[in-house]
Amino acid sequence: MIKFIMLFIISFLPPAIYAIWIRNTEKYEREPWQAIFIAFLWGATIAIIASLILEILLSIPIYSSFKDYSVASFVIAVIIAPFVEELTKPLALSLRGVKKEINEVEDGLVYGAIASLGFSATENLFYAMGFLSYGLLLFFILVAILSLIHI
């Protein structure tokens, strides 16, 4: 249980720090913390679940179309997964608690980035489960750097 708590903190801390930084970059009308939390939570939970379901459904015909398992896995990892993930993350902008707060152009950018960071945090946790043998320091460095690619 202690390992999971450590992995959770290491996985979520860099994206949370980036989210705070992005929220605070607005000069005039900063977004409310509640809406920021909703967008982050969307990315960390619902977008992940929706992505997993869609990726599984779309991978079935891909695996049956290719005789080579490695080619099918490559197509899913390089084409299907990014497309599905980038489709589910911005849906946070349509949430009631977020949508009412969008009144400037950059608001959409802020909430989109925050939802992406939430997605990144959960994805980091998934990867962390497999990285235990490599050491927590290496994993923390990867999380700190790779969280930004989701924005």
What residue ranges belong to the model's regions?
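Hydrophobic alpha-helical segments at protein termini of multi-pass membrane proteins
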Residues: 1-149
